């Protein structure tokens, strides 16, 4: 049909399925979802976060302030597989270990075996890489387990996907007190973000809150529009050249695309979830973090990791505490 630009796909499996079509017909897929990295493609612009912008900042915080031992649970597909591998090697490099590594089929709601094992092992930290309804079921079951077992009162659950609409789905009894790594939270205290949230609610309802994926999709539309205007053409080569010269003042902060990898510079944040389905931002990067889809600079999985600086420090960017 002659379409040259498409904004879309959420899961990595869907992205990988359609990429050959974009390659065959020389189109450009604008992919707005965070993902597990280890990919670049001349026919894809990646505007969501990669590992050094989500799982590494979270794990650096956990390893420095909570524990070196991790209980891991995830959905049985590439997102959890790759992040599980990173976390396994990172904890080992820091003298810790994976207490357990468990996987459920996507959509599986039977978390009883996982909860039973958590009762037994009493981990200080649980890395939740479940997605969708499986994740919601886990949070609800864990909240009940924590109420029943005093040894789990201080156990922290971490996630790289937890967002405001999911907190609302989970419910106020189970959604509070969890650690999340994201480049966007709806509570970012800037005028641009406040305007974005207001406009979002006007469009989708008074109680609606945008997620990181909603913000990334919004940013992607603007980046595409700016690149098309700069190129004065839909030709993907000219559009990419124009894109690499532009930036967008997004709700999260300045966003621009790295010409070497076609991934995006994004502002990393950590937050703690609250009962009202929002997050308290507890730390954020001082500047947009360079994307590192192959972990070339972060060296997160090498033997020297335990002595090395954090990935953001290696990029001359540090997390500052937000009070």
Which stretches of residues belong to each language-model region?
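Extracytosolic ligand-binding ectodomains
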Residues: 1-323
């Amino acid at each position: 049909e002659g379409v040259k630009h498409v904004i879309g796909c959420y899961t990595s499996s869907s992205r990988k399925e359609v990429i050959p079509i974009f390659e065959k017909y020389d189109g450009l897929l604008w992919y707005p979802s965070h993902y597990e990295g280890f990919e670049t493609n001349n026919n894809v612009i990646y505007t969501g976060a990669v590992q050094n912008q989500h799982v590494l900042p979270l794990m650096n915080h956990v390893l420095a302030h909570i524990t070196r031992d991790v209980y891991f649970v995830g959905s049985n597909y590439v997102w959890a597989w790759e992040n599980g591998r990173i976390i396994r090697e990172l904890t080992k490099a820091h003298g810790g270990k994976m207490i357990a590594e468990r996987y459920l089929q996507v959509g599986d709601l039977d978390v009883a075996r996982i909860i039973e094992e958590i009762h037994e092992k009493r981990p200080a930290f649980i890395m939740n890489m479940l997605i969708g309804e499986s994740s919601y079921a886990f949070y609800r079951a864990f909240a009940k387990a924590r109420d029943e077992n005093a040894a789990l009162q201080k156990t922290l659950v971490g996630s790289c996907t937890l967002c405001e609409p999911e907190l609302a789905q989970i419910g106020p009894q189970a959604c509070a007190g969890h650690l999340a790594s994201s480049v966007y939270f709806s509570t970012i205290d800037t005028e641009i973000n406040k305007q974005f949230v207001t406009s979002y609610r006007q469009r989708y309802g008074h109680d609606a809150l945008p997620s990181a994926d909603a913000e990334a999709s919004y940013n992607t539309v603007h980046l595409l529009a700016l690149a098309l205007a700069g190129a004065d053409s839909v030709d993907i080569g000219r559009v990419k050249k124009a894109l690499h010269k532009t930036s967008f003042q997004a709700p999260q902060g300045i966003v621009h695309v790295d010409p070497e990898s076609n991934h995006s510079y994004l502002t990393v944040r950590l937050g703690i979830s609250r009962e009202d389905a929002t997050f308290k931002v507890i730390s954020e990067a001082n500047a947009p973090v360079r994307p590192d889809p192959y972990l070339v600079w972060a060296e997160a999985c090498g033997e020297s990791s335990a002595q090395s600086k954090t990935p953001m420090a290696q990029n001359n960017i540090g997390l500052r505490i937000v009070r």
